[in-house]
Design a protein with these regions (language model features):
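Low-complexity, Ser/Thr/Pro/Gly-enriched N-terminal "stalk/linker" regions
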Residues: 1-59, 85-86, 90-107, 141-168, ...
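Non-membrane alpha-helical segments in proteins
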Residues: 53-73, 86, 109, 113, ...
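Elongated scaffolding segments in large macromolecular assemblies
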Residues: 142-291
Length: 397
């Protein structure tokens, strides 16, 4: 199973045309059920679009763009350039449909514009990472336009004190990165602050970045640069279990900070190494994967029976989504736990390992990866994680 094998699966089943978004899941022939305009406007089944194929449009498309840009850098294929263009336009759309500046939609409904009101940092941040990586590449022919898009989002987030806006004026998702003392929150604050400097070349922005690096966040113990160096294992213990997928985009941001900020090379390299060590432990979960063990019904509409009006309250909206998510897993997609928590966790861990800047970690990770992927029935897999497997092979090359 080489890179082209996974690439074909991704583009034949999981890229949504004409919008250029990578789906969360699809049927074996690429079929998916999209919400209507009415369902989006009523936030049915929930305002976070959990359980829908468009749930992670900005997240997964952003990560995939990042990987394909690496593929293009290595091989300069016109086909890869065309694919990146399709996905970049998809990311543009997720910004263009917003009413509130700084909001990035998760995906769009069947009309190509309707969307759910609650975003998340796991959508905004991969979007930012992808667009900045594209901006730096020689594929970008509209630097002024891409810079303007990035700064619109970055400056809006700073205006909101680094909180993620919903597409409802005055409504925000979770707390501020400015107050965060967790690894992910700190990395996101530092990366975005540094990007504002890189895009504006305003020395005051660089001074602010240095100030953030050297200061202790509210209720924290360590300076932010120390928190960065500690890696994501602490976040896993306190918040996410062993799930690497939610930490991968911030890990990649540290890889970018290593290029942008040589003054803190030691902290960034220690972070990447530490993450690689943690990832190496998590890759072994792939050995527990079972191709059988439950179905995956792509028709999510029965979740609408559990719908309630979230009344523009993000806590209520999340509670509704969580209740539906449990029902979805138990009754509609029992195999998703195996696909996501077992296989997905291992694949994202492999991606972290091959970008750890440590040859020993990368080599061992790929030994496990290449040995185990051949027994996975990829054609019956409903989650779009073939894109992660492809990305691992791109960065290992």
């Amino acid at each position: 199973m080489d890179q082209s094998f996974f690439h074909e699966i991704v583009w034949s089943r999981f890229i949504r045309f004409p919008y250029g978004h990578l789906l969360d899941y699809a049927g074996e022939n690429g079929e998916a059920i999209y919400p209507t305009k009415d369902e989006c406007e009523k936030s049915m089944p929930n305002p976070r679009s959990w359980g829908l194929p468009i749930e992670n449009g900005a997240f997964f498309t952003g990560l995939y763009v990042y990987a394909l840009l690496e593929e293009y850098r290595k091989h300069r294929s016109p086909k890869t350039a065309e694919e990146i263009d399709i996905l970049i336009k998809g990311l543009y759309l997720l910004q263009d449909v917003a009413k509130v500046e700084g909001f990035i939609a998760r995906g769009v409904g069947e009309d190509g514009r309707s969307h759910y009101p609650m975003g998340a940092e796991c959508q905004n941040f991969p979007w930012i990472l992808a667009l900045y990586s594209y901006y730096k590449s020689d594929l970008c022919t509209d630097h002024a336009g891409v810079k303007e898009r990035l700064l619109r989002v970055l400056l809006a987030l700073r205006k909101y004190e680094w909180k993620i806006p919903c597409d409802v004026e005055g409504l925000f998702y979770k707390s501020s990165w400015l107050k965060a003392n967790d690894w992910r929150g700190v990395v996101m604050l530092l990366f975005c602050t540094r990007l504002i400097y890189e895009l504006t070349e305003n020395k005051e922005e660089l001074d602010l970045f240095q100030e953030y690096m050297s200061s202790v966040p509210t209720a924290g113990v360590f300076k932010r640069k120390e928190i960065v160096s500690q890696g994501y294992s602490h976040d896993m213990v306190t918040s996410f279990g062993n799930q690497t997928w939610i930490c991968l985009y911030t890990h990649l941001a540290v890889k970018e900070l290593l290029k942008l900020d040589p003054n803190h090379e030691a902290e960034y390299k220690l972070c990447l190494y530490t993450n690689g060590v943690t990832a190496l432990k998590n890759i072994n979960s792939i050995k527990k994967y079972d191709n059988e063990g439950g179905g995956f019904d792509i028709n999510w509409h029965s979740l609408n029976a559990l719908w309630k009006d979230y009344e523009n309250d993000t806590s209520t909206g999340t509670a509704i989504a969580e209740k539906q998510f449990s029902f979805w897993h138990e009754n509609l997609v029992p195999h998703r736990k195996m696909e996501h928590s077992v296989l997905g966790n291992a694949l994202f861990a492999a991606w972290a390992a091959v970008t750890s800047e440590d040859e020993r970690i990368s080599k061992k990770a790929m030994e496990i990866f290449k040995e185990e992927i051949t027994r996975i029935n990829w054609n019956s897999l409903h989650l779009s994680y073939a894109f992660v497997a492809e990305s691992v092979l791109i960065f290992d090359e």
